[in-house]
Amino acid sequence: MDFESVLAGWDGEHAVVRHDAESGAWMFVCVHSTVRGPAGGGTRMRVYPAPADGLADAMRLSAAMTWKMAGAGMPRGGGKAVLAVPQLPAGEPRRRLLRRYGELVASLGGSYRTAGDMNISPEDLDVVAETCPWVYGTTSGGGNSGRGTARGCLHAIRATVKHLFGSPELAGRSILVQGAGAVGGVLAGELADAGARVLVSDVDEARAAATGCETVAPERVVETEVDVYSPCAVGGTLDAESIPRLACRAIAGCANNQLAEPEDADRLRERGILYAPDYVVSAGGIIQLIGLEDEGWDEAHLEERLAGIGETLRTLFAEADAESITPAEAADRLVRRRLAEARPS
């Protein structure tokens, strides 16, 4: 499929497509919305079946960032970048590619501000920052956003448990964390410290075992009986095939795009499974980076704002119950309202 076909019907503001001859990589920067402020979103580096798949990924994720920023009440719009590479580079070729990518982002004049994502570390962002001033999450900046993402997810799980059981206390509650990476691994430790019975699953069994928690084979995740299932790895795990097999009471995780399609929110409601909308739950990372690097917050104020994720969910759950809608629809209403309020009349 060609790039024009992929872009057809996209409701974003602009997309930048550049081929990097030296590395063979394609650079895609998608700015979905700047209505609430400059677009923010991470950069991922990945090998795709075809370059057009990388563009489609950037488009989809940039739209999700618009909703995440608005849902978190942050003064930013949504964007995303993808470096679609023939193979993951290392050493000096990687460094040169990242510097050229920084020049591309800098040429956009601050309309898009980037951070880390898949296969992009704080050290990589240091290199990007050599040629671009619009970089979050360097080693000298707000740091790895996984800390804020995990902490925000913890507050989200507390709010979810309170709605289900009447108390936010996690002691004795069973929680399955899917993904033991930079976010899931930290989250598992926080949950264990709070007294929860924590189960962890990861495609890398050694990484799951390193958390010190009870482990679950990846193929058994959906059917494992727990109070809360917390997807913190790949998206799209909730669909027409998996939802009927779920054995959890609620879902609250920070993986992006957990629902394979919007109708899956209705499927969860029909099963009596409480769903915390993913873009609300996962906003802690952007809150951390923007708050510490742009807004000048201290750690105490950052923690207050991360706790606000739980407050937002409590409001959404109450609205969903009162109006007999899904929490996902309640969250979408909130975002649409905030975007409409920001648009010039």
Ranges and model annotations:
Residues 69-74, 111-116, 165-174, 320-332:
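Flexible, glycine/charged-enriched surface loops at secondary-structure junctions
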Residues 112, 198, 215, 274-275, ...:
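Hydrophobic beta-strand scaffold residues
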